UniProtKB/Swiss-Prot annotation:
The keyword DNA damage applies. One of its GO terms (cellular component) is mismatch repair complex. Belongs to the DNA mismatch repair MutL/HexB family. Coiled coil: none annotated. One of its GO terms (biological process) is mismatch repair. This protein is involved in the repair of mismatches in DNA. It is required for dam-dependent methyl-directed DNA mismatch repair. May act as a 'molecular matchmaker', a protein that promotes the formation of a stable complex between two or more DNA-binding proteins in an ATP-dependent manner without itself being part of a final effector complex. CDD domains: HATPase_MutL-MLH-PMS-like (cd16926), MutL_Trans (cd00782). InterPro entries: DNA_mismatch_repair_CS (IPR014762), DNA_mismatch_repair_MutL (IPR020667), DNA_mismatch_S5_2-like (IPR013507), HATPase_C_sf (IPR036890), MutL/Mlh/PMS (IPR002099), MutL/Mlh/Pms-like (IPR038973), MutL_C (IPR014790), MutL_C_dimsub (IPR042120). It comes from Thermotoga neapolitana (strain ATCC 49049 / DSM 4359 / NBRC 107923 / NS-E). GO terms for molecular function: ATP binding; ATP hydrolysis activity; ATP-dependent DNA damage sensor activity; mismatched DNA binding. This is DNA mismatch repair protein MutL.
Amino acid sequence: MRIRRLPESLIRKIAAGEVIHNPSFVVKELVENSLDAQANRVVVEVENGGKNLVRVSDNGTGMTKEEVLVAIEPHTTSKIESEEDLRRIRTYGFRGEALASIVQVSRTRIVTKTKEDALATQVLITGGKVEEISETHRDTGTTVEVKDLFFNLPVRRKSLKSSSIELRMCREMFERFALVKNNVDFTFISDGKIIHSFPATSDLFERALLILEDLRKGYITFEEELSDLKIKGIVSAREITRPNRTGEYFYVNERFVISEELHEVLMKVYDLPKRRYPIAVLFIETDPEKLDINIHPSKIVVRFLEEEKVKEALEEVLTKNLARKWYRSVTYEEISSRALSVAEPSSYRWFLVKKKYAVVETEDALFFIDLHALHERVIYEEILAKRVWRSKNLKRRVITSLPDEKLEKLEKLGFSFQFEGESLVVRKVPEFLTEDAVEEFFKEIIHGSTEMLREKIALAACKLATRSGEFDEKTASKLVDLYFQKKYERCPHGRPVSFRISYEDLDRFFER
């Protein structure tokens, strides 16, 4: 057979196969485009594990008609113009391959609108060929609908996994973005059912506690800066492990990466038995010019130009924070009733469901409230505000050194001190603090960290809250009123307090 040049259409199909391996990679590329378009709300919908449909909708900047027609061509991007831009890249996409690859191997519908345009542009593409361009209506943003992935590559189509496996991979890909982009409202829908709904939050670690539920059994959070590196994370206590690496998430400059080097550091510090792995969500921020992310089309492989420096910094941060010993044992009285005493009877129309949920009707939406989660948050805020904690005598002698302002604050929390000569001796501590944890606690206080103290307050609130299924009308009414006064979104552990559905969304669901 003679050597010949391949047709352009075949070249594009082959290239598409290198970027798009399965439906989860469609999710990845489209969500990255949404985030690069400055969206703060992203909805991912899949059908049949993404094999029949992947739809990603956002409220980003959108595209003009001219831009969308350019965007579906290979090696077109708004992210970079030169090699200098590539070295400093901060966006998710930059290769100009994603959308062009997707449209080559699917039936694609793109609807997009900029805030300047009166109407949206709709483009229908089949196997890379533009079939129709029209105008339609939608708010500013973009929806990309990808149907029948690999319909024109039957062998590739047949090689896709079962719908349940493909769904799991799509969900895991979605969760990778939800973990790092806490300021974005994320929704994941499978076959018409909402699987995840994450309202935007200012707390970076809330999502981790929702997605990685076993973290709630024991975790440590930290945020440190070493030289030109910033390292933040939420990691499991040593005794909380998994039999695999499914709880391991590394982010470099907000990009999810797979790194054996970082994994080795994690395992070295934890020093766990064979076939046991920690749960860890780690965020590393560094100068983009000290990274090479253009190694693989998927962009999930990264090379640090100063690898040893990064590894040493991560090891130092993990070692220091895992050395902290905190134990959870708290009992309080009267706080629960006092926390609710500030609320007036609710003026909203609402009703109690199963003695654990409140369904509330407002002018523009229905709210479904988890009363136990809300009660936890109310008590948590009350404890933070009032600082009413019982004390217990400390059996062993602990000497510390504190400035006057911290000494006064701690005394209000239930600590008691006594000067013996020039030494400051701790006599009493709040009930929640165990003997073993006292010295480490004071090290934290001296250096300004209160994170673990807040964690204990949250756990105390959990024990004080009325149990799910045991709420009466009076307590529920006060909680509903407090919800609309305070606008609480999460319980202290990070679980959602409420779910909101607008009447517009309700009409859309019933196809009105």
